[in-house]
Each structure stands twice: as C-alpha cells, then as structure tokens.
Curated annotation (Swiss-Prot):
Keywords: Cell membrane, Disulfide bond, G-protein coupled receptor, Glycoprotein, Membrane, Receptor, Transducer, Transmembrane, Transmembrane helix. InterPro entries: Brdyknn_1_rcpt, Brdyknn_rcpt, CCR1-9-like, GPCR_Rhodpsn, GPCR_Rhodpsn_7TM. It is a multi-pass membrane protein. This is B1 bradykinin receptor. Residues 63-83, 143-164, 239-261, 327-337 are cytoplasmic. PANTHER family: B2 BRADYKININ RECEPTOR (PTHR10489:SF957), CELL ADHESION MOLECULE (PTHR10489). The chain crosses the membrane at residues 42-62, 84-104, 122-142, 165-185, 218-238, 262-282, 306-326. GO terms for biological process: cell migration; cyclooxygenase pathway; G protein-coupled receptor signaling pathway; inflammatory response; negative regulation of blood pressure; negative regulation of cell growth; positive regulation of leukocyte migration; positive regulation of release of sequestered calcium ion into cytosol. GO terms for cellular component: plasma membrane. Induction: By lipopolysaccharide (LPS), four hours after treatment levels show an increase in many tissues. After 12 hours maximum levels are observed in the heart.
C-alpha cells in the first residue's frame, strides 16, 4: 500500500527496504496511475476556488471595519456573533487551501517530496491543525444557534461578542496543540523500493497508532460530531415547534435564515468529512494488522486518498453556501454599495 508506506512508516519495526504490502498488493497499480494523473489538477482547482471564495468572504466580513474603505459610511458595522464564527471558519478554510499546492505537486511526483523537511512539517502541521479548527468551529457555531433558539430568554446573558472571540482563539490554540505530533514526527525519508524521498510520519512505537486514532477519530471527529448532532437535533426540533406560531409572520421566525445557512454548512461539512474519517479508521485497522487481506488494504488505501480530496472540496463549498443559502453576505455586500 503506497500511502501506508509513505505516510506511516515505522523504521524501528519494519524495514524500509522491503515493505511487505508493496510486493503483495500489485493489483491496483493502474488505479494509482490514474490518481497520479487526475488528483493534482483536481487539488489545484480546489485551491483556486477555495482561495478566491474564502478571500471574498473574509473581505465582505472584515472590510466594513476599515474607515478608509468607504469614507461616506456613517457608522462602522460590527460583526455579529454568528459572523465572528463564520469569519473564523473562512479563515481556517483559507489557511487550509494554502497548503494544497504542495500536496498537488507531491502527488504529481508520485509522493516524491521536493520541498525539504521544514516545509514537510509545516505544510502537514498546518493542514492537520485546520482539520481540528474547522470541526471545533462547527461545534461552536452549532452550540451558539442551540442557545439562541432553544433557550432564547437565557441566551442573551451568555452570548457576547467577546465570548465568541475568546472561543475562536481557544479553538485555534487547541488546533495548534493537537497538531504538535505532526510537526514533530513528519520528516522526509528515502523509500528505496519506491525510489522516492517521501514526506512521512515516523512513529517511534506501535502505540503511536492508537494515540493517532484517538486524536484523529475520537477527538477530531466522534466527540465533535456527537455534539453537532445533539445541538442540531434540538435546533430542528425548536424550529418545528415555532413553525405554527410563525405562520402569520412575514419571513418566518427571527433568525431562521441565519439558522438555515448554518444548518446547510453543518450538513455540507459532515457529508464531506465523514468518508475521510471512515477510511482513516480502516487505515488504523490496517496499521495494527487487524485487516490483513490484500484487497481490503487496497480498498482502504485508495479510498483514503479519494476521501482525503473529497474532504478538501468542503473548503471551496462553504463560500458558495454563504452566498446561496444565507443572507449574511448579501447584507454585507449591499452595505458596501
């Protein structure tokens, strides 16, 4: 399996000279050749639209603060609590896509990393940090809507702009801390059988596989998704409960458009990232040799690569969702005209 060798080598336990999976699983070479040809262009396309879309989103959120931008404005617009979270999510997506050109080149070179050890660690660490930052921000966004809609009378005492800003800061710090192992353990090593110098994770001990699974699949997915499902279930229940009362109101319940935007963002995030975490868990089972069948190893390996880049799509989908499913950007755009 190419990605097993290139991403999670254990030089203390397995020889770099003869990875068993390379010689025993040759049936998917044509599939890998196709991926090497197709995925780099796909990743660059995602990077282009992700950069363009998220830069536009951030400009619409942040530029009204700049007095020199529109001298005729009578007052400055302050970001709402929802906008603070969404601006941070756009910033996270922007930082995330900045690392994609390096991986596009890496795949185009058949995992031969040409940028050196420092960029190997920095690019991998930044991508890993933003994986956590993104899902933690989705939890925070869902929790904020939950408080506003399910406990509207008491939420005003808790929902403060400074609190939202502090929450976002803590999320960025948490993402950085959780990415430290990636910064420390990523390195460029020669893999003779593949004739490449690969940017890989070098685990010093078998137990690191379990630690990585807990970090990635539990802290980075299962626990946040449980919270997201809980909050959004009650949000939908609250909206259903308000439906009868809002029938006579023009436009429906207060905040329903913003809530619709956020629910769409949450659904998009889960659809894009669930396959990645599913195959990441299967990859963990391969690493600890619970899965040993060659065909399953190839399915896991190829599936993880495809799911990886399917997850990247989320970074350029979010700006489209802001425009087509929500009123926040429309309000900001009209305010600058």
């Amino acid at each position: 399996m190419a990605s097993e060798v290139l991403l999670e080598l254990q030089p203390s336990n397995r020889s770099l000279q003869a990875p068993a999976n390379i010689t025993s699983c040759e049936s998917a070479l044509e599939d890998w050749d196709l991926l090497y040809r197709v995925l780099p262009g796909f990743v660059i396309t995602i990077c282009f639209f992700g950069l363009l879309g998220n830069l536009l989103v951030l400009s619409f959120f942040l530029l009204p603060w700049r007095q020199w931008w529109w001298q005729q404005r009578q007052r400055q617009q302050r970001l709402t609590i929802a906008e603070i979270y969404l601006a941070n999510l756009a910033a996270s997506d922007l930082v995330f896509v900045l690392g994609l050109p390096f991986w596009a080149e890496n795949i185009g070179n058949r995992f031969n990393w040409p940028f050196g050890t420092d960029l190997c660690r920095v690019v991998s660490g930044v991508i890993k940090a933003n994986l956590f930052v993104s899902i933690f921000l989705v939890v925070a966004i869902s929790q904020d809507r939950y408080r506003l809609l399910v406990y509207p009378m008491t939420s005003w005492g808790y929902r403060r702009r400074r609190q939202a800003q502090a929450t976002c800061l803590l999320i960025w710090v948490a993402g950085g801390l959780l990415s430290i192992p990636t910064f420390l353990l990523r390195s460029v090593k020669v893999v003779p059988d593949l004739n490449v110098s690969a940017c890989i994770l070098l685990f010093p001990h078998e137990a690191w596989h379990f630690a990585r699974m807990v970090e990635l699949n539990v802290l980075g997915f299962l626990l946040p998704v449980t919270a997201i499902i809980f909050f959004n279930y009650h949000i939908l229940a609250s909206l259903r409960g308000q439906k009868e009362a809002s029938r006579t109101r023009c436009g429906g319940p207060k905040g329903s458009k913003t809530t619709g935007l956020i629910l769409t963002l949450v659904a998009s995030f889960l659809v894009c990232w669930c396959p990645y975490h599913f195959f990441a868990f299967l990859d963990f089972l391969v690493q600890v040799r619970v899965i040993q069948d060659c065909s399953w190893k190839e399915i896991t390996d190829l599936g993880l690569q495809l799911a990886n880049f399917f997850a990247f799509v989320n970074s350029c989908l979010n700006p489209l969702i802001y425009v087509f499913a929500g009123r926040l950007l429309k309000t900001r755009v009209l305010g600058t005209l």
